[in-house]
């Protein structure tokens, strides 16, 4: 009887240790899995872009330009290549994430969302694209490190086969109702938005960039 009780207690201790280790590793493992999923989605997007004919690509660009200028083009079809319309790369904070054409909670838990009614991410003077992402998730970093960016840093949007490079010009923390995304005729802008402080989420961190020449061009 004592032998069985001893074995039972030993089993319980092992179980507690296994559960504890699992809980400790869960955020790291989940983050790794989500990052791999994002990489796979971006690879699929690039493959789909490479298979587009020039006519198809031109039509998509024209539809996106029409939407940006007038809002008349079908938003969900303008850059439709599956769920992803572009992807963002921010080397300084190790961000490499797909961009979806919605800002639902489901999307923002795994990727970056494009804010409807703002310019689609194709660039051009008089455009202002707004991208939103969560911060502080235990399973996915997303825009958690956005506050580490400084004025002068750059980020890149990859849309179709174009690389749109933006240099950070302003960083501000404001109330949600004060977030603005007006277009300026002579500027090509993109703003990255996330909630702050992490876990409180009463304000918005807005990192705005202006388009600069891509050194690879």
Outline where the language-model segments fall.
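Short, Lys/Arg-rich, polar N-terminal cytosolic tail immediately upstream
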Residues: 1-2
């Amino acid at each position: 009887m004592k032998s069985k009780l001893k074995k039972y207690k030993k089993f319980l201790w092992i179980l507690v240790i296994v559960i504890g280790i699992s809980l400790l590793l869960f955020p790291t493992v989940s983050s790794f899995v989500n990052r791999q999923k994002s990489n796979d989605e971006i690879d699929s997007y690039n493959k789909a872009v490479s298979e587009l004919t020039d006519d198809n690509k031109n039509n998509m660009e024209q539809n996106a330009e029409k939407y940006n200028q007038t809002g008349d083009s079908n938003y969900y079809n303008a850059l439709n290549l599956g769920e992803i319309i572009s992807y963002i790369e921010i080397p300084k904070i190790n961000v490499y994430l797909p961009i979806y054409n919605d800002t639902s909670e489901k999307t923002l838990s795994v990727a970056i969302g494009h804010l409807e009614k703002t310019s689609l991410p194709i660039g051009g003077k008089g455009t202002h694209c707004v991208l939103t992402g969560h911060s502080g998730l235990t399973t996915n970093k997303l825009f958690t490190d956005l506050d580490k960016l400084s004025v002068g840093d750059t980020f890149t949007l990859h849309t179709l086969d174009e690389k749109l490079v933006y240099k950070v010009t302003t960083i501000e923390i404001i109330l949600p109702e004060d977030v603005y995304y007006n277009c300026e005729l002579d500027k090509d802008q993109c703003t990255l938005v996330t909630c702050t402080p992490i876990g409180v989420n009463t304000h918005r961190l807005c990192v705005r960039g202006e388009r600069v020449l891509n050194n690879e061009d």
